[in-house]
Amino acid sequence: MNPIVISPAAIAAETDPIGIGAGTAPPGSYVLCVNLDAPTSMTIGAHGTAVLPAGGYAYVGSAFGSNGLGRVDRHRRVAMGIHDVTHWHIDYLISHQNASLTAIVVAPGADIECAITSSLLSRMKEPPLEGFGSSDCTCTAHLFISGSVTHIRNQCSTVIQELSASSN
């Protein structure tokens, strides 16, 4: 399960290498890499109002339903303002005007959402909002912050690569 870094533009053009945009993607785990341009106050569902610092964010998720990693295309459409339903915690962040979805790191076929989270927790600052994205598991949070979106994307790719090596 080598990590695959995909741009939102490739998904929109249906040219991504695993078929997310074409609706033929397999199930797997993913990390949304988000840049927040400025400190931002926002209401996040039941969490209430939170102030998030500017920087690079990584949101860890998984998609094992009938549409597989096609869920990532929904996130892309929310980030672009094409789909305006806020269903998951991450929707509040990626739909904010100060946020931009810059890349998606995927691990097709791998159910490693919480393993990615655990590894990132040991490498990154504490999650900025406890419980964010982790209401269906025992993880502290599924959202992590770093100084830059490039750094966080590279960390996520490294984590997935290491998890792959340790499972072989």
UniProtKB/Swiss-Prot annotation:
Superkingdom of origin: Archaea
Name this protein carries in UniProt: DUF123 domain-containing protein HQ_2548A
Pfam family, one: DUF123
Residues making up the signal peptide according to the UniProt record: none
Species of origin: Haloquadratum walsbyi (strain DSM 16790 / HBSQ001)
